[in-house]
Amino acid sequence: MLRNGNEGMSTIPGFSQIQFEGFCRFINQALAEELDKFPTIKDPDHEIAFQLFAKGYQLLEPSIKERDAVYESLTYSSELYVSARLIFGFDVQKQTISIGNIPIMNSLGTFIINGIYRIVINQILLSPGIYYRSELDHKGISIYTGTIISDWGGRSELAIDKKERIWARVSRKQKISILVLSSAMGSNLREILDNVSYPEIFLSFPNAKEKKRIESKEKAILEFYQQFACVGGDLVFSESLCEELQKKFFQQKCELGRIGRRNMNRRLNLDIPQNNTFLLPRDVLAATDHLIGMKFGTGILDDDDMNHLKNKRIRSVADLLQDQFGLALGRLQHAVQKTIRRVFIRQSKPTPQTLVTPTSTSILLITTYETFFGTYPLSQVFDQTNPLTQTVHGRKVSCLGPGGLTGRTASFRSRDIHPSHYGRICPIDTSEGINVGLTGSLAIHARIDHLWGSIESPFYEISAEKAKEKKERQVVYLSPNRDEYYMIAAGNSLSLNQGIQEEQVVPARYRQEFLTIAWEQIHVRSIFPFQYFSIGGSLIPFIEHNDANRALMSSNMQRQAVPLSRSEKCIVGTGLERQTALDSRVSIIAEREGKIISTDSHKILLSSSGKTISIPLVNHRRSNKNTCMHQKPRVPRGKSIKKGQILAEGAATVGGELALGKNVLVAYMPWEGYNFEDAVLISERLVYEDIYTSFHIRKYEIQTDTTSQGSAEKITKEIPHLEEHLLRNLDRNGVVRLGSWVETGDILVGKLTPQIASESSYIAEAGLLRAIFGLEVSTSKETSLKLPIGGRGRVIDVKWIQRDPLDIMVRVYILQKREIKVGDKVAGRHGNKGIISKILPRQDMPYLQDGTPVDMVFNPLGVPSRMNVGQIFESSLGLAGDLLKKHYRIAPFDERYEQEASRKLVFSELYEASKETKNPWVFEPEYPGKSRIFDGRTGDPFEQPVLIGKSYILKLIHQVDEKIHGRSTGPYSLVTQQPVRGRAKQGGQRVGEMEVWALEGFGVAHILQEILTYKSDHLIARQEILNATIWGKRIPNHEDPPESFRVLVRELRSLALELNHFLVSEKNFQVNREEV
């Protein structure tokens, strides 16, 4: 939080700052911490010792550029050099060696792994420490338990049973006496009794036999091992038994870590040093004391709130990368030990360089990281749909992943909004579906304390004395466990009269409760109305007038907006659009002042301080979501520029502001049922004037391989048995030409796969050709890359990547231009979404009193029940802004200045627009905001006045071209013989339970029978029915059962139930009855 000259003002922190801070901590601290833990590798037989030093490690600059890494499908990484020492007898060697490559974060806060942009999102987990809870059993008796959570996520429970004996549950099945556990950890009975507040309870439950088991540490360890590992018989104490117990129990369940030690000390009032990060007997005894106090009413009876953010911690990119680095160093240790043995077998003199070789040992580091980025649930493909998604993706927090919750098992309480989320995690922005409440987004002012993993939120200190004493502390960052002790005034309540503040009462938050208290009792207040929301929520104008569910949908749908060919910034915004676009890094900002020498579509040449700087531009590059990323220069040749000025704008930005959609004229009225149930009626103007036209880039790739016989596949244009028309776009190498227009079914890359002679089907004609002309039959199979359905477009790029002569990969990029069409999804910024149902000629659209036809018609019934009234304010203010040539940037909760502030603003602007344009219909006092409009087909006015306005409408990535699908025949499931599911597999349309009910309701028995049997899983009938349908013949009626019935019979047979079936008809019914 930076403060400028104006004392009350503050700037919003960089939105990608959290990712950068995390990675910097990994590079500067975490690497050294892990290298310090690397043990000295000793081989006593040969008097050899190998050691790595944390001091003075170096990371080289990446050997390739970002663009080249993406182009050649490589990992953007940096080589790590560390100091190593090898002691061999009396010979000591020191060298700086490379131990491998580490992926490097780029300016977007992402990593490039094998040419793909990936991002690591933050995980929110329960902090290590101890948590108490009480619950009632089936008899209504309170059961008190204390759960100890380790840094690894392992859990152990302390509980008191009905006989008042204290147990430690170390696994689901095994519980161990607390005395045995304490003794196994190194305490004798006297020390235990001296360190507890209730020694009589500890002495009451062990009998003579149990006391004998804990006489010494060795006996206690044997008893503990027998109970923990469920091992019977007589065990003998040994070092290997201790090591196994250490590995299986103490390491996983007793390592608290730095955060766990702090939490344990704080919860149990202990003063154990912070560097002692393991669970001690003293911790266990203090925890048991507290549990006894809760049981007998002498301790604090409050349960720990597991959902409070003070009991959670954030695992950022630094922690996750540090874990992987430690894992890689562990593998490196084993590899070095093997290499040492190999060196002595060969009887060669070792050096640090020979022990860590680039080919075998140091490759472990990069492979560990590539596996992590490829398989770890919190490593995701970077969402590049539009600039907003790029900014928001790195600010996600997830409860899912290793050590966290799962979508299937998480409770309602763990998903719900908690008072401690206020100003830290957005109460609105979360995913819909099974993961609702489990993935969230950080509030815009929140920051992560990387030392303790807590989320902090800024507040203004009200106390005048403190402000005078220490001015820089005017803004304080409070962690979740600190803000419970402060009276916090909400910044979005009605503003105070500056003159008589002391006499005012204000709503405030104290200890998770909302109170109304006097102003002088307030300690801190919110700094910004946006403080509680994420970026997505902060971009919704008039959010305070919307239902939270619709705001949630809006913040999600803004991330699905497709960049349009001609972007336009919103008339009504919130003021956060500029910073969102800036932090997405899609635009190019001048880093120094200078003069423009020249600009073109590929680069900008800038002269600064006597140097010529070339700034490359992104030119029609495919994003991870197949949208088009493109930068256009915005500075003319010869212009002098200043530092911070925009040189080139990216997709979906205008003038440095986010521009995801278009301002279009909308009317809220029904129209012939075409906007029933959220359907949207649009004008053909949006199609012909390319208002909602977007560009999409599809990638198609093919790779040559070596067959099982050792023959190599070949890329060529010479493909037999194919029409010349399909090969028309190929060059002499067999690859499609740049700039070609390709249609469905065209060949993009010609490829032949060799086959052995026995695989080729020799037909009679082949023998004749060989006998007459001496021609050999082709023994190759055509396996070319063909353009799939819906892939038509212009070839804009072809990449030929050849790692070795036999391994060739060809990638073809095709640009598609998509106008808006029936079936596309559009949405506003208030959760008002819909599908295009009809495109009307502009002359048939309803038109205003000045003759302007409306662009979109929404259903008015979509507003009252959804309670997203913000769209009404936005459309009316947008109309006024369009007529007055103004843009508005309105912070939320403007009712804090006066009652009905939003309504007053909208009406005053509409009235001004009406006066300026001399159009009285813009503001009619009887029905402000509404107007009489006319039917385009008849010219008659509609009966009721209609709300018209300019709304900012987005086109979403759910487009009909990627959804529409049909099938006659295709692949079938092997077991059920029913059509497979999904568009990608050319699957069929599912007729489910409810669809069957609908058909039953209409009594269409024959159609129902065809759908469920003949057309689906009747092997013989489905072949005949296709032929009968094509030729218009009668559909045959087969009497044998379909395949799914046979599957049912076989399943019953596997349960030892025999089911026989036979056909009963009019002819054989009498016979069968007599036989029976």
UniProtKB/Swiss-Prot annotation:
Enzyme class: transferase
Catalytic activity entry: RNA(n) + a ribonucleoside 5'-triphosphate = RNA(n+1) + diphosphate
Source taxon at top rank: Eukaryota
Main localization category: plastid
CDD domains per record: RNA_pol_B_RPB2
GO CC, alphabetical: chloroplast; DNA-directed RNA polymerase complex; mitochondrion
Subcellular location: Plastid, Chloroplast
UniProtKB keywords: Chloroplast, DNA-directed RNA polymerase, Nucleotidyltransferase, Plastid, Transcription, Transferase
E.C. number(s) listed in UniProt: 2.7.7.6
Molecular-function GO terms, alphabetical: DNA binding; DNA-directed RNA polymerase activity; ribonucleoside binding
Gene Ontology terms describing biological process: DNA-templated transcription
Similarity annotation: Belongs to the RNA polymerase beta chain family.
Assembly with partners or alone: In plastids the minimal PEP RNA polymerase catalytic core is composed of four subunits: alpha, beta, beta', and beta''. When a (nuclear-encoded) sigma factor is associated with the core the holoenzyme is formed, which can initiate transcription.
Described purpose of this protein according to its UniProt entry: DNA-dependent RNA polymerase catalyzes the transcription of DNA into RNA using the four ribonucleoside triphosphates as substrates.
HAMAP family linked to this entry: RNApol_bact_RpoB
Record protein name field: DNA-directed RNA polymerase subunit beta
Protein species of origin: Triticum aestivum (Wheat)
Lineage of the organism: Eukaryota, Viridiplantae, Streptophyta, Embryophyta, Tracheophyta
